């Protein structure tokens, strides 16, 4: 029992350290070639007169920005200049979440969700609910998030781990190579797969997987 409790603690730490910060920010097709502005021109306009940028350029500016302050400025500009577009709220929420402001992130994700209830806004709200311990609500959001990629499987696996459904967690994690996947395999008693998973990832953190 003590070992199980320690393993659960490791799973929660992995949730905080790895899954939650990696929110599904909305992806854009780069349209710079079409609109004729270089990255430098877009970032310069963001700094000096963001109102001249299209919504795609504004969100793109956040994607290419090198620092978080500029990213936040881009998404704030998107919300101000294009208040009906969900992407600014979504990405601004992601920045708040990564900064540890879960409440602020949830408010922005809710606004994004009202603008457009799509798989990504559902997924992000699911992550917030998972972080807040509202597992049933998180599962409802995840159920409407099909199409966001492997992160959905990871999030569902962590949810199953929290519920003690280790076999279900291992079954849904698929071929994902991450510290979280390693935890799932350890808790399911599959140490060989856990080891191969750790070996395959770029930045393995074995400490997360050796708490028992």
Predicted regions and their residues:
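N-terminal targeting segments with Sec-dependent signals, encompassing both cleavable signal peptides
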Residues: 1-211
């Amino acid at each position: 029992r003590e070992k199980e409790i320690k393993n659960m603690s490791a799973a929660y730490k992995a949730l905080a350290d790895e899954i939650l910060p990696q929110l599904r920010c909305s992806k854009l097709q780069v349209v710079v070639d079409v609109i004729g502005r270089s990255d430098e021109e877009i970032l310069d306009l963001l700094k000096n007169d963001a109102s001249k940028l299209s919504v795609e350029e504004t969100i793109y500016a956040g994607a290419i920005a090198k620092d978080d302050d500029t990213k936040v400025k881009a998404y704030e500009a998107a919300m101000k200049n294009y208040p009906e577009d969900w992407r600014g709220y979504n990405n601004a929420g992601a920045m708040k979440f990564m900064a540890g402001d879960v409440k602020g992130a949830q408010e922005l994700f809710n606004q994004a969700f009202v603008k457009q209830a799509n798989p990504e806004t559902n997924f992000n709200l699911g992550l917030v609910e998972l972080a807040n311990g509202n597992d049933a609500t998180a599962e409802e959001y995840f159920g409407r998030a099909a199409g966001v990629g492997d992160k959905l499987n990871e999030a569902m696996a962590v949810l199953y781990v929290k519920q003690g459904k280790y076999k279900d967690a291992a079954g849904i994690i698929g071929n994902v190579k991450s510290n979280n996947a390693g935890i799932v395999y350890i808790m399911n008693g599959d140490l060989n797969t856990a080891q191969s998973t750790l070996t395959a990832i770029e930045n393995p953190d074995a400490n997360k997987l050796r708490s028992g």
